[in-house]
């Protein structure tokens, strides 16, 4: 699921572990007793992102502070999670992909109108490629998010065209 400092992190259905090479042992970092872990990832700043049936939780490992993340559309179920090279958290749900920028506290939602076909995204088939593209797989296929294409934050200008001119009724 990722690395923080020099430690690789792993998860099962209720625990997140870090592997300590020096001690040759796994240490439990987070335990989700009442919330099954569907997907998890860790960023370079030490924020652990855990997706479960009751929503997203982020744990700041340096301070051990834990807080929920509310999705803008009220959805609670995230089944796929990956963090790109820029720190954007990509989350897959039923037919929707969320891109969350934690620095700006800003969401972008991608759905069928953006080319994301209905898909039940899965936790394991996720990849951030060396070129920055994001790949998220599900039961209905694979989605590639081309990071070279930037979404327009400013809508294109409206252009008006004259269709007909009438002078004194003619």
Where are these regions (language model features)?
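Residue-level detector of Asp-centered blade-edge/turn motifs that repeat once per structural unit
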Residues: 1-5, 42-45, 83-86, 128-131
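Residue-level "micro-hotspots" composed of small/polar
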Residues: 29-38, 54, 67-82, 92-170
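Short, compositionally biased segments
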Residues: 3, 11-13
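Surface-exposed loop/turn elements that mediate protein-protein interactions on large endomembrane-trafficking
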Residues: 17-19
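Conserved beta-propeller blade signature
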Residues: 7-10, 47-50, 88-91, 133-136
